[in-house]
Amino acid sequence: MSRKDDFFNHITEGNKSKGDYITLGSAMLDGETITNAFVNVPLKTLNRHGLIAGATGTGKTKTLQVLAENLSDKGIPVLLMDIKGDLSGLAQPSPGHAKIDERHAKIGLPFEAKSFPVEVLTLSEQDGVRLRATVSEFGPVLLSR
């Protein structure tokens, strides 16, 4: 059995879930996407808090977008703080692109252009639903809960 086959089997066996899950993408080996080697996250392992960290250009925003889209598809509400506006495209279906089709073919997942329910909240005077309280108004006791 080749190294690639061993890797594929390791990923597919390790990503079996008894409950509901979301698929983040496909695993990579030596910089190559392994088609249908899906990376799944069981919904029961996702809690209220998470951290996605990395250097510029490593896919943090795309990871957040994929998580938000998949959770929305499962009916789970998501709150994202998007100061730069990178995730505003969630509200509109993608017009599609050859690179997107190529990437999805490598992953082994079909691409479906669709929009997601988005509610824009704001702390400033910009467009959006104005939040009536700021973080400083909550106080340390409420924030610690």
Q: How should each PLM-predicted stretch be described?
A:
Residues 123-145:
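ATP-hydrolysis module of ASCE/P-loop NTPase motor domains
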Residues 1-55, 62-74, 78-79, 84-115, ...:
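Basic- and hydrophobic-enriched, low-structure N-terminal and domain-boundary segments
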